[in-house]
Amino acid sequence: MKIFKCYFKHTLQQKVFILFLTLWLLSLLKLLNVRRLFPQKDIYLVEYSLSTSPFVRNRYTHVKDEVRYEVNCSGIYEQEPLEIGKSLEIRRRDIIDLEDDDVVAMTSDCDIYQTLRGYAQKLVSKEEKSFPIAYSLVVHKDAIMVERLIHAIYNQHNIYCIHYDRKAPDTFKVAMNNLAKCFSNIFIASKLEAVEYAHISRLQADLNCLSDLLKSSIQWKYVINLCGQDFPLKSNFELVSELKKLNGANMLETVKPPNSKLERFTYHHELRRVPYEYVKLPIRTNISKEAPPHNIQIFVGSAYFVLSQAFVKYIFNNSIVQDFFAWSKDTYSPDEHFWATLIRVPGIPGEISRSAQDVSDLQSKTRLVKWNYYEGFFYPSCTGSHLRSVCIYGAAELRWLIKDGHWFANKFDSKVDPILIKCLAEKLEEQQRDWITLPSEKLFMDRNLTTTS
């Protein structure tokens, strides 16, 4: 019996030791990031040149050149089966993009970073210089996606406000601060919110940026708000041309509320932690809300807008707007009715009459979102994947996205389809170059015709 107890004791000790050793080895392997040192063959590096360079934190040092999968973006645009097939093959691989600490590393030296990304080669026209645009970027994750978005919309004559969620990871915050330090026309919002989904804090984040942008010395004409999974569909030259056509009007979705959305602002909502979730959500109570102040008629739409500076100045100096904001604090997703309603308030700059027809998300060029229940009716099927009924676009949609006519689109994710983002950025740079060089070439031809005649 004594021998059995002794044997049992030693066996238990051995099991504990083996368990401890296994956990220690797993932690060590994770710390060393073995996947980067000895990657498997079926991977795809989204940023091959950077991921194998000394400019990032998590460097792939033993990657064979065969991992570098070349795709022709012109072929993707023309929907050539071979190139579309390549993009589908890449999606079957383990897609590895730069992590937040990689963005921190590559933006730690601003001169090197700007050279790596070719900011000095960005072309700008006289028309763009005289028509600066402001941006409000409300972000919380995936620093590399935000970095790509900023690179795509960057123009030295524009102004950019970044609002990052106070709850965001520290590494993400450092990456955003680094980006802002590298440019005189990019800054972090002076007041940062802890943003909760469908809560007033999301609207407040944009308002914080708008307030800061009004204090800027850059006299911007319009402001556009975006999130980290958005991407432009127009070059800056084309966007300036489109904004000029507005002639002081605003561009956003504004429709009469369907019955399914009435509860959002007719009942009091309280922010509560949802069971089995790691988030807080505004939960409807049985307490009815009073009618909106000043006989304001509610319209609904999107959280995203294109607003004139005159409109933005007005809302910060108008008591009706302030009262309406206070009334909206306990509603569900107030950012989806706040702007859509204000644009209908009589006397506001760029006003749309209450009796005017609805402006749907398809009519407003602000932002293209493909909902799965409208696919096949209003737009072709999604070739990527879906998240909460919203399409994350695939490479086969490149041509449609550019030709559709919207100015921005959502959602993009490099882990779903990195080729689409790469090719869209390439196409926008090509369009910017073509639009800027075209006038000079046309002028040259006109002069030649005049000389020969």
UniProtKB/Swiss-Prot annotation:
GO BP of this protein: carbohydrate metabolic process; inter-male aggressive behavior; kidney morphogenesis; neutrophil homeostasis; O-glycan processing; protein O-linked glycosylation; thyroid hormone metabolic process; tissue morphogenesis
Principal cellular location given in the protein's record: Golgi
Tissue specificity annotation: Predominantly expressed in thymus. Weakly expressed in pancreas, peripheral blood leukocytes, placenta, small intestine and stomach. Barely detectable in liver, spleen, lung and lymph node.
Localization per Swiss-Prot or TrEMBL: Golgi apparatus membrane
Coiled coil: none
GO cellular component: Golgi membrane
Lumenal side: 35-453
Keywords: Disulfide bond, Glycoprotein, Glycosyltransferase, Golgi apparatus, Membrane, Signal-anchor, Transferase, Transmembrane, Transmembrane helix
Any one GO molecular-function label of the UniProt entry: acetylglucosaminyltransferase activity
Membrane-protein topology: Single-pass type II membrane protein
Record: glycosylation sites: N72, N286
Catalytic activity reported: a 3-O-[beta-D-galactosyl-(1->3)-N-acetyl-alpha-D-galactosaminyl]-L-seryl-[protein] + UDP-N-acetyl-alpha-D-glucosamine = 3-O-{beta-D-galactosyl-(1->3)-[N-acetyl-beta-D-glucosaminyl-(1->6)]-N-acetyl-alpha-D-galactosaminyl}-L-seryl-[protein] + UDP + H(+); a 3-O-[beta-D-galactosyl-(1->3)-N-acetyl-alpha-D-galactosaminyl]-L-threonyl-[protein] + UDP-N-acetyl-alpha-D-glucosamine = a 3-O-{beta-D-galactosyl-(1->3)-[N-acetyl-beta-D-glucosaminyl-(1->6)]-N-acetyl-alpha-D-galactosaminyl}-L-threonyl-[protein] + UDP + H(+)
Known EC number: 2.4.1.102
Cytoplasmic side: 1-13
Origin superkingdom: Eukaryota
Function in brief: Glycosyltransferase that mediates core 2 O-glycan branching, an important step in mucin-type biosynthesis. Does not have core 4 O-glycan or I-branching enzyme activity.
Family: Belongs to the glycosyltransferase 14 family.
Name of the featured protein: Beta-1,3-galactosyl-O-glycosyl-glycoprotein beta-1,6-N-acetylglucosaminyltransferase 4
Organism of provenance: Homo sapiens
